[in-house]
Amino acid sequence: DLGTSAVKLLMMDENGNIQKIVSKEYPLYFPYPGWSEQNPQDWFAQSMEGIKELTSECDKSQVAGISFGGQMHGLVALDKDDQVIRPAILWNDGRTAKETDYLNQVIGKDKLSEYTANIAFAGFTAPKILWMKENEPENYKKIAKIMLPKDYLAYRLSGSFCTDMSDASGMLLMDVENRCWSKEMLDICGITEEQLPKLHESYEVVGTLRPEIAEELRFSENVKVIAGAGDNAAAAVGTGTVGNGRCNISLGTSGTIFISSEKFGVDKHNALHSFAHADGHYHLMGCMLSAASCNKWWNEEILGTKDYAAEQTDIKNLGENRVFYLPYLMGERSPHNDPDARAMFIGMSMDTTRADMTQAVLEGVAFGLRDSLEVARSLGIQIDRTKICGGGVKSPLWRKIIANVMNLKVDVIESEEGPALGGAMLAAVGCGEYPDVETIAEKLVKVVDTIEPEPELVAKYEERYQQFRKLYPAVKGLF
């Protein structure tokens, strides 16, 4: 799982037993306000170190396949010599407001939706390509290959220039309904299909290890490399959110609400993304750019502590907090599509406590996720329960808040590994251990706890949420 702050590596046997987990961190760079970049070489170096540590005590001849979940939307540009042209521009980078406006207003949202089933968001890949064309023309002219983050790893490991349908959906370059590149979008961005990777389903084998990689890792050259999926689709596989009408909420660095569907569908208001799913079907997804990262920022940067649980012990009266928090540290995607939006606290008084502020952060993220749920409900999608994954799931209090803010039964699954487990499950399908993604999800995903919404608390949070909805429109002019 190639995340924003670290790569998590997981080793699973053919029966779904997790043998070992390793995590390797790498830096994130903010060279200018609103920018967010990483060095792809850091991803590769840490992944290689992680694989060596992960397999240090196993019979390496038994390694059958490698697959991926990964942060989406990032632009990795290589030249004709396969050298990285510039640092990768990440999913949470907000520099492309001008290019996003051009796509939505000049090309037009209706045309974009016709070409790709989506409109432009600042984090998507196509606006980043246009930004390079306008601001770094010499770098733009050097582009021979355009990749997404996890696909850079696949290329370094296997030599296969490829991507999968779920991750490619978030580039704004793909005709999602027909699962192919959009000629119209390529023309708009001034690129050719030769500069883009070959499209695969997430469970398909794209190649085997390069000989020099196999030698360094002491693996067989026959180890299969499977396409993998964008982190949210991989997490959905890892939580069993496949097939028709199932929901998963991810509380990672970003927050998502993910609804699987066997049929292609589009939100006509474009507040939800319409993407291909890793199971070969489709999904709708709402994405907020700052979720667990809000809690990390509040605890570590403001309070100066890493003991998140201790900060939550004094939170007592759920649904009665008078402080609101708008969770827009990096702008916002769903449903506002506003890269200039910013976080703020509202409603403090002399008796506001540290615990009130901590509670407001947890509730603000839950309210932000509910914004996307309300869009899904407006489309007639009936949801009464959801799986949940991501780092924020470790907080029982946050799980309870989400269940009652959303008025959903929240199923906690046995494994907390989300995208990494989903990647391993896709590898198992690609290696022929299971016939399809639905079968392995049915066999391996186990629910260990369910949080039931409490009617009295649901009513309190309903009132609070209706107040929350008024805040962004009221303060938007300040950004």
How should each PLM-predicted stretch be described?
Residues 16, 39, 66, 93, ...:
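Residue-level signal for inorganic ion chemistry
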Residues 1-2, 249:
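Two-metal-ion RNase H-like nuclease active-site motif
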Residues 2-86, 114, 142, 214-215, ...:
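N-terminal glycine/serine-rich phosphate-binding loop of ATP-dependent small-molecule kinases
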Residues 25-27, 91, 289:
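A generic structural motif
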Residues 97, 104-119, 127-162, 172-183, ...:
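Active-site core segments that coordinate phosphate-bearing ligands/cofactors
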Residues 194:
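A conserved beta-strand/loop element that lines the FAD pocket in flavoprotein oxidoreductases
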Residues 52-91, 119-125, 154-175, 198-201, ...:
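Short beta-strand-loop/turn "lid" adjacent to the catalytic site in phosphate-handling enzymes
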Residues 86-100, 413-414:
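Short, acidic/small-residue loops that bind anionic groups at enzyme active sites
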